[in-house]
Amino acid sequence: MTTTKQKITKRLVAVLALALALCAFTEPAEAQQILLTGPLAGAPAVRKLRLRRKGRFEIAPAVSFTLLDEYQRTILLGGRLNYNFTDWLSFGAWGAVGSAIRIQTDLTDQIQSVNAQRRAADPNATSIDRLLTANNLGPDFKKQLGGIDWVVAPQLTAVPFRGKLALFQSIYLDTDLYFFGGPAFIGLTERKNCAGTTSDPCSGPTGFQTATRMAIAPTFGLGFNFYINKWSALGFEYRGLPFSWNTGGFDTHGGGKDKKFPDNKITNDDRQFNFNQVLTISYNIYLPFQYKVSE
């Protein structure tokens, strides 16, 4: 057994020595630059490239829809204005108003249905099931919900990919994929803060009123453009707006250890972090109407 181990060890040492020797005497590799001659010398990678963006203003009326909302969905009407410094870089802003069109979810309808039944059965709020929600549910749950009133977002846009899309092997459209990011200023309506005292109650007629404020958050996302003709395109865009707010008007934090339990009042601690998502459809108009073409 010992003899066998010695033979195996000698073979391994020999293999390692051979490998080191090959590495030591390997000649260095050298690369040679290929110099093009003739008509291709100094030519660009693509000729007659349509510069859909360079030097043009982009005016894009748009409609946006919030996604994955708990209590109500918001339809935002607005648009985007960009100036394209190059075909791959632009700066501008997106803005929209969302206070006009809001649609409650089925969850909101169910909560209000149970809330109305309990209030009708016990108008004086003496039952235990009413006392537990006295500070969280007003007479009309829909009126205490948080909502996005408006958004203004200056942003920088980068366009790393572009190409063509073929439809039914007969229709060809220029397309591009872009990414954007920047700060967003968001106007919000939320249930106003209350101290839960006699002078500032969190229940009763005045305890469920709303107030407005402005939040500042990052915004980022990506989009696709499908160019219809020389001066217009159809755009689809996904946007993230992460910030903290009280969407349901509930008392969820502020008391107990680390303020993770209800405290029978409405404060800034009750605002929960939400990754708000928006889907936008736009019709893009480019000025001047004629695009440039590369050499």
Segments and roles (model prediction):
Residues 57, 88-91, 164, 230-234, ...:
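Repeated loop/turn-to-beta-strand initiation elements of outer-membrane beta-barrel proteins
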Residues 72-76, 104-109, 168-171, 190-205, ...:
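Outer-membrane beta-barrel translocator domains and adjoining extracellular loop/strand segments
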Residues 89-194:
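Gram-negative (and chloroplast) outer-membrane scaffold detector with strong preference
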Residues 154-157, 273-295:
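Outer-membrane beta-barrel "beta-signal"
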